[in-house]
Structures are given as structure tokens and as C-alpha cells.
């Protein structure tokens, strides 16, 4: 068992984890995270933004978690409940990964216009935001201000690692 797997076992075992996946190229990496969370005995529910489904298929997360992957606020094929509130109340922790500049800006300013942002804003659970984007976008003063706002509102923002990015650049953002 790796060090990260041991830590995950300690922190997420028997916890309800809400995993928000946004539309960045790093979306495919989140399947591994979902798998590790499930392996650590977390109950993982995934919400994907409209753009995220262009990078990875919801069936991947459904297979890994055993739960329907939520991709639409107005899904008409559901049991009667206010789904974003039910998921928000269920969550012991909310993770948004990869977090695009767009979704971080929405969360920093209280904009709730899709299933992910409405659910995150409705949840009282601790929130972990993992930005992933091009270095220029990440270092943009507007993005940095939004990150500071997210921290001010009590969200934990993980600093992205540095390396070779999908666009061919080397820098921070992966």
C-alpha cells in the first residue's frame, strides 16, 4: 500500500465524498482518484460539468463508484428529491478536481448555474479545490484573486504541481 493510499484510508474510510469533475484535460486523471477513494472504502458520488463529459465519459465514474454520475441539474429520470441539496447534505467532504478557472470563479463569487456549483455552494462539508490549467491562466491575477477568495471562504486550495502541460508548456498547473 502506498503512502497516499494509507492516508486516504485514514481520512475517507466510510465517508461520503462528493467529487466534482470539471472540463479540463486533467479530467481523465480523476478516474484514478475516484478508484483510490473507493478502494479506501469511501462512498463516492460524482458530479460532472457539461464540459467535463467532453474529456471523460460518465460511465467511467459510474463503473468505478457504483453510483449514477450526475451531469445535469434537470435530470428528469430520478427519484423525487431535490438532488443538489440531498447530495450536499450527504457529503462529508467535497472535492473539485480538476478545478478550472471558470468553476473556481463561479464558486468564489457564489454563482450557481449548474449541478456542480449549486451542490458545492449548498454543502456545509469541508471543500478541497484542486486547480488544473495552463500556467498563464493559473498565474493570471484574476485567478489568483479567486483562489484567495476561495481560501477566505474556508475552502482548501491545493497548489498544482509543475511540469509538462498538455499544451506543451512547462510550468505550474498540472
Residue ranges: model-predicted function:
Residues 2-128, 134-174:
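A cross-family phosphate/adenosyl-ligand binding-site feature
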